[in-house]
């Protein structure tokens, strides 16, 4: 087979590997969401203790992250001073613990499908908080896009058959804390040149989350668990659930650099629609036409936002490349002029 054939085989192999990783990420993300719903929902496994579940996840993930970094040397550790940890990682850990606590709590009150629809507000929250902290520039066009997403989610909420005010407050709170966490990562870590992949993030952030969650757990859930004599810790259920949560982070780590931002965004959309379909067909949650119409509007707004962000990123990369080419051209011209000037100054025989 010729050189062209070998190249084609290599390209095909890379495509297969990339989309295999994407499929694994979709599967694990889907599994974690449905599994958490199964454990927390009072009509299913009936263990409505979201703080405890989150603490189990954090304990499991921090232990495995420690083993991968310190024992098996699978991931390179990131050097970090105590001052940097306290000033940068601890606030992010606090926000992450609140986001996980509230998002897991929402599964007790809301359907999986409706939660996915509410999560469409994430770009709105990230953009708004980014503008507030001056990490994003205010643009009328982008704000109109954000309003269209919000309008779509409002329609979806209006058509929700199992609308629960407390559940919606919890999920919106989770979105707000998660969006703030993402902006804080830019301010407290990225701006300082600190880059954490999902595994090193768990290594540094998970123990911090565990410490923050311990305070509300002692007050809210521990007294109830202590008095519930009928409960026995199911190692199979909680072990496999925690393993899926960690595997999801590992899948994200493996996926970094294998696909484009557009591919990841499309994968996220596919996952959301699959969850809505699963929630309707298997869990038997009610999904109304108004739900779908509203989410459709929000989905188009999110798709346009992702497309605009990707185009801006491409334009920035193209400008950076052009600048590098201009600098290289200027350097070569200077060298050429210098060489010519040197030859002119040489004495003739």
From Swiss-Prot:
Name under which the protein is recorded: Probable sugar phosphate/phosphate translocator At5g25400
Membrane topology: Multi-pass membrane protein
UniProt-annotated location(s): Membrane
Organism: Arabidopsis thaliana
Region (Disordered): 321-349
Membrane found in the keyword field: yes
Family matches, as InterPro entries: Sugar_P_trans_dom (IPR004853), TPT_transporter (IPR050186)
Pfam families linked to this entry: TPT (PF03151)
């Amino acid at each position: 087979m010729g050189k062209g054939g070998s190249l084609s085989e290599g390209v095909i192999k890379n495509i297969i590997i990339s989309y295999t990783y994407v499929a694994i990420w979709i599967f694990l993300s889907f599994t974690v969401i449905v599994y958490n719903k199964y454990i927390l929902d009072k009509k299913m496994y009936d263990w409505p203790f979201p703080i405890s579940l989150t603490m189990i996840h954090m304990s499991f993930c921090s232990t495995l992250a420690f083993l991968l970094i310190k024992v098996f040397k699978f991931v390179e550790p990131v050097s970090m001073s105590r001052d940097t940890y306290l000033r940068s990682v601890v606030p992010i850990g606090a926000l992450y613990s609140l986001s996980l606590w509230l998002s897991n709590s929402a599964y007790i009150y809301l359907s999986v499908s409706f939660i996915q629809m509410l999560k469409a507000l994430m770009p709105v929250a990230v953009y708004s908080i980014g503008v507030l902290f001056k990490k994003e520039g205010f643009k009328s066009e982008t704000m109109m896009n954000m309003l269209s997403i919000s309008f779509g989610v409002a329609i979806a909420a209006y058509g929700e058959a199992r609308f629960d005010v407390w559940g919606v407050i919890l999920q919106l709170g989770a979105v707000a804390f998660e969006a703030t966490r993402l902006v804080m990562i830019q301010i407290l870590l990225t701006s300082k040149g600190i880059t954490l992949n999902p595994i090193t993030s768990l290594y540094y952030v998970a123990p911090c989350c565990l410490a923050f969650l311990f305070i509300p757990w002692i007050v809210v859930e521990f007294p109830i668990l202590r008095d519930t004599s009928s409960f026995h810790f199911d190692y199979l259920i909680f072990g496999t659930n925690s393993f899926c949560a960690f595997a999801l982070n590992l899948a994200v780590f493996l996926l970094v650099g294998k696909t484009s931002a557009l591919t990841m965004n499309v994968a996220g959309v596919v996952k959301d629609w699959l969850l809505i379909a699963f929630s309707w067909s298997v869990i038997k949650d009610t999904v109304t036409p108004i739900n779908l119409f509203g989410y459709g509007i929000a989905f188009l707004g999110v798709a346009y936002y992702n497309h605009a962000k990707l185009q801006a990123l491409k334009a920035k990369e193209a400008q950076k490349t052009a600048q590098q080419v201009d600098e290289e051209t200027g350097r070569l011209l200077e060298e050429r002029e210098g060489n010519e000037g040197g030859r002119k100054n040489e004495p003739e025989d």
